[in-house]
């Protein structure tokens, strides 16, 4: 019996297994003479055991019978060498307005903004002055790559359907044609198949093309997804790593310098991270008051975009719940506006 992407199948115990894992435990585990289970990311974000996998005792480390890592694949000419570019800003202004009152704070980086203000990563992903410079970097790199490989293409991973439409409009404003494919797209697989052999330069995806989809001409990726798990991040990066010829030896991924994603990027050379491929005791998830990745009631709208460069755009955030400010016994919502200076900086992480 052969399994691909075995990490989707969870569980050693039927009570802690998912539906796919239960089928393996009930129908395969004691019947197959030999099993071959494959995965490029052999761990699960919920920390559950992978079905049929073996773990050391008492450490709980995954025991692999054979490893063929990214470095091996690059050496053999099977995969491209990843180049990851993180976009940051050295002067981010946050303006808080409440009625006639306003206050301004400056942050030296996006990490500081996210760590010390109510602004969330997902809200930043909808800011035109985050979307545009990341797309522009990807577009410039794709232009360069197509000088050598004329059919090279780019992938943009979006957060949800409206976000994908916003990104598509931005690409069109740059003179680029693109396709949009989401988990709601009728005949989505046909759209992907058509793009695979077309001359279209860009495809914008939501919930698609992150795993198991082979489009070898993809060589550039702009990561604008709100998902910040290492499994998803590596699966997306894998979409641009497939090498097809002598001259396409590099893959490029562009993203915001968000601390969690930066940590994933910095250890992409580690094929089996020790803190991930470990069997842990699984607990029922509880409320985490620190997490602000998807604030309830958050509304986002673009307010007057000024200028055409990298600065001048502002984004308003109506933050509710824990961010309500009380004045005279009446709750009112502060409005936060973020603006970026032209002092963008790029950090390049090169692997192998």
Task: Enumerate the predicted regions with their spans.
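SF2 helicase catalytic motif II
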Residues: 1-37, 41
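Interdomain helical connector at the RecA1-RecA2 junction of SF1/SF2 helicase-like NTPases
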Residues: 47-151
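Conserved RecA-like P-loop NTPase helicase motor core
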Residues: 177-283
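Conserved H-loop
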Residues: 40, 159, 207
């Amino acid at each position: 019996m052969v399994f691909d992407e075995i990490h989707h199948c969870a569980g050693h115990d039927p009570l802690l297994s998912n539906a796919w894992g239960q089928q393996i435990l009930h129908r395969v585990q004691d019947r197959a003479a030999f099993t071959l289970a494959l995965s490029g990311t052999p761990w699960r974000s919920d920390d559950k055991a992978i079905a049929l996998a073996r773990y050391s005792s008492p450490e709980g480390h995954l025991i692999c019978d054979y490893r063929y890592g990214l470095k091996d694949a690059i050496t053999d000419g099977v995969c491209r060498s990843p180049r990851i570019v993180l976009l940051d800003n050295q002067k981010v202004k946050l303006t808080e307005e409440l009625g006639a009152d306003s206050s301004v704070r400056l942050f030296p980086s996006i990490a500081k903004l996210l760590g010390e203000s109510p602004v969330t990563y997902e809200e930043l992903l909808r800011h035109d002055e985050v979307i545009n410079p990341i797309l522009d970097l990807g577009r410039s790199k794709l232009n360069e790559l197509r000088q050598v490989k004329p059919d090279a293409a780019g992938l943009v991973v979006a957060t949800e359907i409206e976000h994908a439409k916003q990104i598509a409009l931005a690409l069109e404003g740059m003179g680029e044609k693109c396709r949009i494919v989401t988990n709601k797209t009728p005949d989505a697989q046909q759209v992907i198949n058509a793009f695979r052999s077309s001359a279209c330069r860009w495809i914008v995806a939501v919930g698609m093309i992150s795993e198991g989809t082979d489009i070898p001409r993809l060589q550039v990726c702009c990561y604008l997804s709100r998902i910040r798990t290492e499994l998803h991040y590596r699966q997306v990066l894998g979409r641009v790593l497939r090498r097809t010829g002598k001259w396409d030896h590099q893959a490029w991924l562009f993203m915001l310098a968000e601390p969690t994603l930066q940590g994933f990027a910095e250890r992409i050379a580690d094929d089996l991270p020790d803190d991930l491929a470990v069997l842990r005791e699984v607990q029922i998830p509880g409320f985490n008051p620190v997490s602000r990745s998807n604030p309830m009631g958050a509304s986002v709208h673009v307010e007057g975009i000024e200028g055409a460069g990298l600065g001048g755009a502002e984004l308003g955030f109506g933050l509710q719940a824990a961010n309500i400010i009380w004045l005279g016994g009446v709750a009112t919502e502060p409005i936060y506006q973020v603006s970026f200076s032209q002092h963008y900086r790029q950090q390049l992480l090169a692997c192998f």
